[in-house]
């Protein structure tokens, strides 16, 4: 069933926070949100300009507290794709920060209004519909200082976001640690996913990969993995 896929990545860590610290211009914090513990990332620069990537649950109190404590200016709410475990808390977050703009890949926009695409009913038992304004992005666009990389396959509109100055990649459910996203859900494609993985493998080896459901990794590590399994 549809929900079987998501149960396979459920960490049962509802409400817990895991912090990843990196030296450099950008700092990245990981919050595990929703029933599946989706990795949702708060990134902020030296000027306290902040980005929030994916919003997998309603348990946002720790997010609000952190943003307030560090006096961050949340300007960008960014979705790597439109599956329910990445959008469940979107209405809550967007209403709490009405000045922040919400971004998603243009091909995945319909996921925010169609539960058959987002699988939100199977994931968290609700028919999700986004209530705010959405901004769509495509290959080569910039969201603040992050460059949009078109990485379809898990969904047709999956995007990754690359912060070149610090070599940080937000990969959503396209590339995991020693794994990659499923391609047999609505709009998914193995051919497109393989193309996307090959594209990401061309980034610098030292690029740190923050993904939707596993520990962070690097492009160099995952290039070697993809070579071993025959994708590269």
Where do the model's predicted regions map?
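Short, positively charged and aromatic/hydrophobic N-terminal segments
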Residues: 5, 11-12, 18
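Short acidic-hydrophobic surface loop/beta-edge motif
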Residues: 20-21, 31, 43, 139-144
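Short Gly/Pro-enriched turn/cap motifs at secondary-structure boundaries
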Residues: 31-32, 132-134, 150-152
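Residue-level marker for buried hydrophobic side chains located in beta-strands
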Residues: 51, 78, 102, 147, ...
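Metallo-beta-lactamase
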Residues: 58, 119-120, 148-150, 155-232
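Active-site HxH/HxHxD metal-binding segment of metal-dependent hydrolases
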Residues: 58-60, 65-143, 224-228
